[in-house]
């Protein structure tokens, strides 16, 4: 937590060069639904849910350089994942789609994994903007289109 606060203060002290930050989660099966849903979201300075969001959180806030000072971010680098390097612009949701079903169930739980696999909900829809995880009944209420598929899903 102290490290993230120090990063935040550094970003704010350099707001002429840094104009925001990106939430970056670890690409593996141990990442929380909260962090997975926020991965790749970009925020202006001093806004958004700043990591560390929970005990043992491994997510980080990556600074985004003001375009005036940007010297090469158009070059797509790599990002670490449990399966080896992936493109730096790969989000957790994109990574999770490529994993086997057991990993998706481990991360999301059985019912959320069904929703994710069906394409009815993206990973970002499992939480609110602050990262609070919606319960299954809340998901059903917030997403009326799920009512048509509720025969195969348990919303209790």
Stretches found by the model and what they are:
Residues 1-54, 63-156:
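Domain-core detector
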């Amino acid at each position: 937590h102290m490290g993230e606060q120090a990063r935040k203060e550094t970003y704010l002290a350099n707001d002429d060069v840094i104009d925001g930050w990106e939430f970056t989660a670890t690409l593996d099966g141990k990442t929380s639904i909260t962090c997975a849903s926020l991965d790749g979201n970009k925020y202006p300075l001093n806004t958004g849910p700043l990591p560390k969001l929970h005990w043992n959180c491994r997510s980080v806030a990556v600074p985004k350089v003001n375009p005036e000072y940007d010297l090469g971010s158009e070059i797509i680098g790599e990002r670490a994942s449990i399966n080896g390097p992936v493109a730096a612009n790969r989000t957790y949701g994109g990574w999770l789609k490529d994993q086997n079903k057991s990993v998706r169930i481990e991360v999301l739980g059985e019912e959320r994994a069904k929703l994710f696999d069906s394409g009815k909900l993206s990973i970002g829809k499992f939480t609110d903007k602050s990262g609070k995880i919606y319960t299954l009944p809340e998901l059903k209420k917030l997403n009326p289109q799920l009512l048509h598929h509720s025969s195969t899903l348990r919303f209790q």
